[in-house]
């Protein structure tokens, strides 16, 4: 797979946050994104995800050398972007990360539920699978969102500050999991943990309206 951004200009309400962005992401790449708050890091992720249409420029997705409309993507947003008042259980939130569609009637298939159960067990959240998300702590919610990002076995995993609110033990487990996923998928991660980014990212870019390739 590949993602190709060319001459991207993007922002909100006419205010530019990204200017002249050109970036290539290849299969099993690991791109670490750093930069100041408000510099456009999350805006760049939203362009990747198709959640924000750029003012100008193009974004192209490829699989096996051929252009496709989209890729299988797992996404972990910042918890502040999540409406925890929405009446869903932990299990439903995790299952919602499936890229394959739900059945028209009856919700998720048996196979989808089994996959959700498997990833919840792996991440260590099975004990509160039936709990409503509004009852979770910040650290618990971050684990749930991490599981949701992984459940579809994505080709591209996008993580926006995944280490927020998690304790040291889970952070170590999460980083180890990310390294394992990178053997099969490309990773794009925004993080303030420069040590991890510098140790494991194959590419490092700094975003502050424009992008600067650091490695």
At which residue positions do the language-model features occur?
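Helix-to-loop junction immediately C-terminal to a conserved catalytic motif
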Residues: 49
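Hydrophobic anchor residue at the start of the ABC signature
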Residues: 146, 174
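Catalytic Walker B motif of ABC-type/P-loop ATPase nucleotide-binding domains
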Residues: 157-161
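Conserved ABC transporter NBD signature motif
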Residues: 54-73
């Amino acid at each position: 797979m590949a993602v190709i951004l060319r001459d991207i200009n993007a922002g909100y309400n006419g205010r530019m946050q990204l200017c002249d962005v050109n970036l290539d992401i290849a299969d099993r790449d690991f791109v670490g994104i750093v930069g100041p708050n408000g510099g456009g890091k999350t805006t760049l992720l939203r362009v990747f995800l198709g959640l924000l249409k750029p003012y100008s420029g193009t974004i192209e997705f490829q699989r096996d050398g051929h252009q496709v409309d989209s890729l299988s993507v797992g996404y972990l947003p910042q918890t502040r972007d999540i409406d925890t008042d929405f009446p869903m259980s932990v299990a439903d939130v995790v299952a919602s990360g499936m890229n394959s569609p739900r059945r028209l009637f009856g919700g998720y298939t048996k196979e989808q539920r089994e996959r959700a159960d498997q990833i919840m067990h792996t991440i260590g959240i099975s004990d509160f699978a039936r709990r409503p998300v509004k009852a979770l702590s910040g650290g618990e919610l971050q684990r749930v969102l991490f599981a949701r990002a992984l459940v579809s076995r994505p080709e591209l995993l996008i993580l926006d500050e995944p280490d927020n609110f998690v304790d040291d033990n889970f952070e170590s487990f999460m980083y180890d999991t990310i390294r394992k996923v990178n053997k099969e998928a490309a990773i794009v991660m925004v993080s303030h943990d420069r040590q991890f980014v510098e140790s494991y990212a194959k590419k490092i870019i700094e975003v502050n309206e424009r992008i600067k390739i650091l490695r």
